[in-house]
Amino acid sequence: MLRRALMAAAASERVRDVVTRAPGARAIVNRYVAGESSEDAVAVARWLRSAGLLVTLDYLGEDTTDAQQAAATATQYVHLLGKLAAEGLTEGGAVEVSVKPTAVGLLLGGGTSPREHGVRVATEHLERIVIAARDAGTTVTIDAEDHRTTDAALRIANSLRSRFPTVGTVLQAALRRTEADARELAAPGTRVRLCKGAYAEPLAEAFDSRHEIDRSFARCLRVLMAGPGYPMIATHDPRLVDITRSLGFALPEGSFEYQMLHGVRPDEQRRLAASGAKVRVYVPYGGDWYRYLVRRLAERPANLALFLRSLRSKA
């Protein structure tokens, strides 16, 4: 119930105005967001790499219906990749980028669901980013958003992967369709990130309880880990980390990776990396941090309590 209410708040402009102006908001945001500039993102990536961690960077922003903004977001990624390459951070895919299709034009053409014009624009911008990533020695993961964009996002990823095989895609265990998608994507060389999902979805499309989502995650995890692809297991849940570790014992070294969010269980990230596991940290940056913050609060109620205490103390 609390999680669904917070997800609804992520879409509320009134709540957004209150939260973004709150004196305690910035301190909480700084735990999870690298900063607002590409220089901030590069600095955090450099720091994480020095600790033996891999990185994926996400320029915050989504649901754009402005063609110029979509193009500007693509340009931001291209410039970021150039800066990362200049510092030697992209070698071997050590630092890659994650891109939300709606940030680069998927919803252009009107409405809340993708249309052909938006799919075409997003594909063109994503191809530009993928080429820049390839030239920098790294790759791109096409992020997942709410269920209305899933078919279009997978279609774009499949199209790009036919020419750029390292392009990754993301599946959300909260969606009822995901186990079938996992079976289809468990193919040689396919990079698939499995996460729980962080969007408010209708019950017809998604599981509602944490227990159901966890069970779905475990089923999808087993499908991906048994396949010939490259699973990227995005979870902080100790039980799911343990299941992943158990399934990974029989696999060749380096054939899968863990992924965790910047600022969430950093000690566990380093512990896993020190044990020899590949661990990639998902690092967002940019000024459009509100929805990202709300999703993090929804996932971890303790963070919500901390945030509310901070607001009261600084009011």
Locate each region found by the language model.
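Positively charged, amphipathic and often flexible ligand-engagement surfaces
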Residues: M1-A315
